[in-house]
Amino acid sequence: MASSAKRRAVETGQNPQDSDESSDEGLEDSGDDDSENSEEEVNEEVIVDFEAHTISDNDFHGIKTLLQQLFLKCHVNTSDLTDIIIQQNHIGSVIRQAEVPEDSDDEGDPDEVFGFISMVNLTERQGVECLEKLKDMILDQCVKCSTPDGQERMENLLQGNAQSVGLLLSERFVNVPPQIALPLHKQLQKEMAEAQRTNKPSGKCQFCLMISKTCKPLKKKSISAGDQAKDELLFVNDEEECFYEQATVKFSYCVQDEADSCATGKWSYDDEPMKPFRTVMVIPMDRMDTIMQKMTDYLTV
């Protein structure tokens, strides 16, 4: 059954799809009698409220779609991973559009998932096929893209039992504003503390493993004398740079062969073509307070 809102995180953002529809309507209404107005650019900002809800069975398709955007063509069973996320619904949230008044023109699906957050304990779920495939993929990329020290530390974490590692998943569509991440992460930390108190696997994590969608600008064909191309790593979810700064193991691998040039949501770059990457990070859980403070400073308006 559909879940009810257990807490609310209201934010404002622009929905590109809605803006496109508004633009089309404006052009149709202007008619042929006013061709000049019909050619004018329509730049309408759409106000959207979002709410955080407890994860439920109804969210399967939405969560799976977001996981597919993260993992692309790698051999991770996103259906099985989605099932795990739904089964442990005592931790994590999904983002939906706030309840729309009956007299509103908005015909969107009230159960549409715009994003989600969750934590899956990898150490406690050893032998689960989709998670083993995920760990194999990370270790393979680590061998190719990380340092020998990074490889050794990653192997010890993912293949050993001495320290518990949780997979932190925080995904949303690009048109959802980053400010919504702050209350979601704060709520997740509270839920993990409660899971620890009640001896649930999600509360036993000593390290946090993240896979972030990142991009680097495509290098220009010609560079002026003395001008060096900056190898800048851009995070699709802006706030995840706070985790990157505190990571003790981190590396990036290119997914250009698996995806088109990614849109970062940083429109000030004039939609400059980007080379898509995935950035893997390991963060000690005792650094979460520092991360949350940095995130608060960055996202608080």
From Swiss-Prot:
Per the record, its GO cellular-component terms are: centriole; centrosome; cytoplasm; mitotic spindle pole; nucleus
Keyword Protein biosynthesis appears in the UniProt entry: no
Highest rank taxon of the organism:
Eukaryota
Q: Where is the composition biased (Acidic residues)?
A: 18-43
**Compartments it resides in:** Nucleus; Cytoplasm, Cytoskeleton, Microtubule organizing center, Centrosome, Centriole; Cytoplasm, Cytoskeleton, Spindle pole
Keyword hit for Transmembrane: no
Q: Name one GO biological process term.
A: mitotic spindle organization
**InterPro entries per UniProt:** BCP1_family
> Could you tell me the keywords of this UniProt record?
Cell cycle, Cytoplasm, Cytoskeleton, DNA damage, DNA repair, Nucleus
- Region (Disordered) residue ranges read 1-43
Family statement = Belongs to the BCP1 family.
Q: What's this protein's function?
A: During interphase, required for microtubule organizing and anchoring activities. During mitosis, required for the organization and stabilization of the spindle pole. May promote cell cycle arrest and DNA repair.
Name the UniProt record assigns to this protein: Protein BCCIP homolog
In which organism is this protein found?
Danio rerio (Zebrafish)
